[in-house]
Curated annotation (Swiss-Prot):
Primary gene name: queF
Pathway the protein acts in: tRNA modification; tRNA-queuosine biosynthesis
GO CC annotation terms, alphabetical: cytoplasm
One term of GO molecular function: preQ1 synthase activity
Residue numbers binding NADPH: 94-95, 262-263
UniProt-annotated catalytic positions: 194 (thioimide intermediate), 201 (proton donor)
Keywords assigned by UniProt, alphabetized: Cytoplasm, NADP, Oxidoreductase, Queuosine biosynthesis
Keyword NADP: yes
EC class: oxidoreductase
GO biological process annotation, one example: queuosine biosynthetic process
Family (UniProt): Belongs to the GTP cyclohydrolase I family. QueF type 2 subfamily.
Record-given protein name: NADPH-dependent 7-cyano-7-deazaguanine reductase
Length: 286
């Protein structure tokens, strides 16, 4: 269970981030612009250790504003799909990622493979973990799809809400042990706030589980309770996963959130104890 105490207020690892500060934009390649945040900051607070994580998965990023110069100086553009392993020591702070990608804008690369290899090397070094990068060229833009999350949307439930403070206790006594089900639910009402700037982060979340049937109204109240909660996207998804395992006793569980983009980047954390992410397709709000 993950009650809302603040593990971040004294975290020296956050003090040096460019996030929330005035920033000069560099247009020439500089890998040092990337900044990582230790995953342990959040995981310690929800009683997780790197040696015994209850899930696997990835932080799935889409970079829509990737541009560089080819060997002749002509601008090139692409989209990048990036997957960062859940086992990496650090998550990548998104503003630093944006600044890093901007540094490609006036930098010459011999070919697209050189761009891909540079991204893999730099992101892996910052995150201290495994990274995969797929670069999508303009000739393939037309096949990029907009999809809906799988499952049954719970947002039309007619509930009255007056409390918007994060509270995992909404999941207390939320299951029916006499009904063992396998189902997929989703909501577009996920909103949290940036840990540093408190800017709103808008997202949709899919929950696929097997186990005692979860009361959908209680689940929706729980998700709505993130509305004024300050935490990075990746941390929110891991918190949801841990809370559902604790309160709802899911025997199998996947939590997959897709957040709207900011600065040309969207972040889509995926955590599961029984399946792996498939192709990454954006939602309408992304």
């Amino acid at each position: 269970m993950t009650h809302n105490h603040d593990p971040y207020s004294d975290a020296k690892e956050l003090a040096g981030l460019t996030l929330g500060k005035a920033t000069d934009y560099q247009a020439e390649y500089d890998a040092s612009l990337l900044q990582g945040v230790p995953r342990s900051l959040n995981r310690n607070a929800i009683n997780l250790t790197a040696e015994s994580l209850p899930f696997h998965g990835a932080d799935i990023w889409t970079a829509y504003e990737l541009s560089w110069l080819n060997a002749k100086g002509k601008p090139m553009v692409a989209i990048a799909d990036i997957q960062l392993s859940h086992e990496s020591q650090n998550l990548i702070e998104s503003k630093s990622f944006k600044l890093y990608l901007n540094s490609f804008n006036q930098t010459k690369f011999d070919n697209i493979d050189a761009v891909q290899k540079t991204l893999v090397q730099d992101l892996g070094e910052c995150a201290q973990g495994q990274v995969t990068v797929k670069i999508i060229e303009p000739k393939s833009f037309g096949i990029q799809r907009v999809v809906e999350l799988p499952g049954t949307c719970i947002d039309d439930l007619d509930i009255e809400v007056s409390d918007y403070d994060f509270n995992p206790d909404y999941l207390e006594n939320s299951t029916d042990d006499k009904q063992i089900v396998a189902e997929t639910l989703n909501s577009n009402l996920l909103k949290s706030n940036c840990l540093i700037t408190s800017q709103p982060d808008w997202g949709s979340v899919m929950i696929r589980y097997q186990g005692p049937k979860i009361d959908r109204e209680k689940l929706l109240r729980y998700l709505i309770s993130f509305r004024q909660h300050n935490e990075f996207h990746e941390q929110c998804v891991e918190r949801i996963f841990v809370d559902l395992k604790h309160y709802c006793h899911c025997t199998k569980l996947t939590v997959y959130a897709r957040y709207t983009r900011r600065g040309g980047l969207d972040i889509n954390p995926y955590r599961s104890d029984f399946e792996h992410p498939g192709e990454s397709h954006r939602l309408a709000r992304q």
